Design a protein with these regions (language model features):
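C-terminal accessory extensions appended to soluble enzyme cores
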Residues: 99-128
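PAPS-dependent sulfotransferase catalytic domain
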Residues: 2-79, 83, 89-103
Length: 128
């Protein structure tokens, strides 16, 4: 499947409810996922203003499974993180470290997603 044609309802439904997400891009797959999350939630995805979103990414089963794993529930986030310490990046130049970010409205699309894979996997394990 090509991502632009990949509009599973669970992705749209879940993303529409997310206000916060925790993402760290360490490899190409996580970089891909940040593109996906950014595109589907209407949030800018990079600190390079000239970077073009790749339209023809092939989405594998592994991508889909990892993408589901990276959808962090807002309720869990609110319990896990002290909201007063939530980092909201509006200055792209400040994005240098891992941290929670609050999803800004689409009218302010300057943000970076930072996924701590271990924390997300542990959370998913708790749900089983």
């Amino acid at each position: 499947a090509i991502w632009k044609n990949y509009q599973q309802s669970y992705v749209i439904e879940t993303l529409s409810k997310l206000n916060y997400i925790y993402v760290r891009r360490e490899n190409k797959l996580e970089h891909f996922l940040s593109f996906v999350i950014a595109r589907e939630s209407g949030i800018y995805h990079t600190d390079n203003l000239n970077e073009i979103f790749p339209n023809n990414i092939i989405v594998t089963t592994e991508h889909m499974e990892l993408f589901q794993s990276y959808l962090v529930a807002e309720k869990w986030f609110l319990e896990f993180a002290n909201i007063s310490e939530t980092i909201v990046y509006e200055d792209l130049g400040e994005i240098k470290k891992d941290g929670f970010v609050k999803k800004l409205p689409y009218t302010k699309p300057k943000i970076e997603y930072i996924v701590n894979k271990q924390e997300v996997l542990e959370y998913i394990e708790c749900l089983k």
